[in-house]
Amino acid sequence: GEIVLRIEDLDRERSKSEYIDAVQRDFEMLGLTWDRGPFFQHDRDEAYAAAFDFLKERGLIYPCYCTRADLHAASAPHRGEKLVYSGTCRSLSAKERAAKEASGRMPAMRLRTPDEVISFHDTIQGDYSQNLERDCGDFLVRRSDQAFAYQLAVVVDDAAQGVNSVVRGVDLL
């Protein structure tokens, strides 16, 4: 296999050059070299826009006007539980959407997740099954500030870069 170094820097406020330098130093300290990259997500808006348009044309995304405070109030997860989007904006009418936008709320865009169990085998965790709608809810693909969300970008990049194995924490399965 190959090691691909991708700098996931969509959040420009939190992405600083010293963090990128630290990642590269860590690779060197561990005696690792990357075969391809570094690639920077902030350079790939065109690819993310194409994927976004693909989803939109198929009716798979919809506008969401919920704030973080709204989401926490609706879900009220207990400590250690993750926030699951309840689908509040999933079925808003055009009139309801227009009223929210008239009040100044700009929507984020969410991917409509299916109400079905998805199963796969993870090399580290073993067999894994999850109902995305129930366990995760519809997730963001574009934020209200029009920046593309990590969840969209990482999938587009994995496909474009031929990534088929990723080591991440179980919380990101």
Predicted regions: what they are:
Residues 1-80, 171-173:
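N-terminal Rossmann-like or analogous alpha/beta NTP/dinucleotide-binding catalytic cores
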Residues 68-173:
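Active-site cores that bind ATP or allylic diphosphates and position pyrophosphate for catalysis
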